[in-house]
Swiss-Prot record:
One Gene Ontology MF term: DNA binding
Official protein name in the record: Nucleoid-associated protein Spea_1509
Keyword DNA-binding: yes
One Pfam family hit: YbaB_DNA_bd
Disulfide bonds: none
GO cellular component term of the entry, any: bacterial nucleoid
Highest taxon in the source lineage: Bacteria
């Protein structure tokens, strides 16, 4: 099925991809994204590993309704998480050459 050295080359390529994936995952964990809500009145900065680093609330919101502020914080967190996911997909697509992995399949194996 594989020519001379074909299996060895395939294994070498798989190892190289796995090494690249590990580097990309480290890069993703270090990156930061900022999600916003209320036209930027609430901003949440989150790392690639979904840790919230900072919450910025415009002073004008502190005078308003507590429930609205809570909703905006939740929306900003969700926006930041969505941005992390988008960045992860982009970075992984660079490594896999755009190859789509089955849902739920995590790299490296």
């Amino acid at each position: 099925m594989f020519g001379k050295g074909g299996m060895g080359n395939l294994m070498k390529q798989a190892q190289m991809m796995q090494d690249k994936m590990a580097k990309v995952q480290e890069e993703i964990a270090r990156m930061e994204v900022t999600g916003e809500a209320g036209a930027g009145l609430v901003k949440v900065t989150m790392t690639g590993s979904h840790s919230v680093r900072k919450v910025d609330i415009d002073a004008s919101l502190l005078e308003d309704d507590k429930e609205m502020l809570e909703d905006l914080i939740a929306a900003a967190c969700n926006d930041a998480a969505r941005r992390v996911e988008e960045n992860q997909k982009e970075k992984m697509a660079e490594v896999t050459g755009g190859m789509q992995l089955p849902p739920g399949m995590k790299m490296p194996f």
